[in-house]
Amino acid sequence: VRSERRLMEQVTYNMLFRWFIGLSMDAPVWDVTVFTKNRDRLLRGEVAGKFFAAVLADPRVKPLLSPEHFSVDGTLIESWASMKSFRPKDGSGAPPGPGRNGERDFHGEKRSNETHASKTDPDARLARKSNGQASKLSYAGHVVMENRHGLAVAATTTRATGTAERDAGKAMMAGLDRAPRSMLGADKDYDTRDFVAAMRGLGVTPHVAQHKNGRRSAIDGRTTRHPGYAVSQRIRKRIEEVFGWGKEIGGMRRTLLRGLERVGWGFTLRVAAYNLIRLPKLLAAPA
């Protein structure tokens, strides 16, 4: 089901949908605007963040969390806006073709976030995760994972910029409940002087992968020689399980929501859901 409007159409005539949500055959179906009103109410109450924090604060969960070993990473969340909506901010450019969703000729047009913006979702930014991949209108989702059991302990969403991962990493680690001396594993995108210095200023040892292609790494042998560095680099890859579940199962690959606040709300709920999926098995394991 691609949208909330289509969902309500299904509930209207699909007996399986009615059975699943407990509606009798002759019960009236609520209006689709109920979703929007309830979502706005949850946004105002910051329910997603509070729910995420409440799961981690549970007395049964807290002993599972490492207070000093963490990993950080980010992923792109494709916006619901299409590339057709990415138009010059000054209003120039060829007009779209006839029709509600008319075609536009982008041939020869240079497009960037400085000169263009989406008319459908102004908070979305043109971005790509790596060279060789197509650029898409996206948001950036970020997670900090504790390394003992691979549970997410911090999550946030930002506009997809070149420094978004490092900026979000600094903010999340600064607000994290952790031991005074901690370690943070990360990939080579975090290997910058600014990020490494910020982590050390927070009392966090940056176990970031070294970026050796054409520039000097911000960390040296004083960090990489320790056995803990290799362990952090091995375990940090588990954070991809959070993003993999969110995109394949949680519907996070392409958001149906618009605007940074709403997309962030949806991302945080999905990360909390990932923790909940993991917890029954972890709690049932012998101490």
What are these regions (language model features)?
Residues 249, 253, 280-287:
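A short, flexible helix-boundary coil/loop motif
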Residues 263, 273-275, 280-283:
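TerminUS-proximal long segments
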Residues 91-99, 105-106, 188-268:
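Helix-centered, glycine/charged polyanion-binding patches within enzymatic domains
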Residues 18-22, 281:
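Short arginine-rich
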Residues 9-12, 21-202, 274:
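Polybasic low-complexity intrinsically disordered regions
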Residues 71, 142-144, 152-156, 183-185, ...:
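Structured core elements
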